[in-house]
Amino acid sequence: MLRAGTNNGKGERGMVNLESIEAAAARIGASIYESPLMHSKMLPRLTENSVFLKLENLQMTGAFKERGALNRILTLTDEERRQGVIAASAGNHGQGVAYHATERGIPAQIWMPRLTPLIKLSATRAYGADVVLYGDNYDEACAAAIERSLERKAAFIHPFDDDVVIAGQGTIGLELLRQNP
């Protein structure tokens, strides 16, 4: 369970390094699509540089954020799985948590700002999450979500201040290096 001021989702300070990213890649590999890397034909003319595009829009939820969400979900203890997970998001992270938690039978509650675009809200619900609309912005929704996770003793999956999430998202870098050494 996340405690305020921690960054690895387990209540400890850690560090993201190549080893943790490689471990994440091994952990999530069976459930994440290795997206293609395409050389842009137009952008080099505008930037005077070679530009490659990593097509993460082809992931199940349409964004790279699910890599980190899945990595964190796969590191949950049995007790954390039973308690369910809580996250705060304005869209992509929440969809990743919702999809991968639901796929594994883990209850997911996603807190989103009241003014979240309908397409993000609808997709998060469609992936199986209980969505709570709260606050005027992400920070307000996140603070309330953390408070609820502490009350319920549920794991909080932070979208960016969690080393396990960051390592999962970092797996995109390993793919980039493999695809374009």
Predicted stretch roles:
Residues G5, K10-P181:
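PLP-dependent amino-acid enzyme catalytic core
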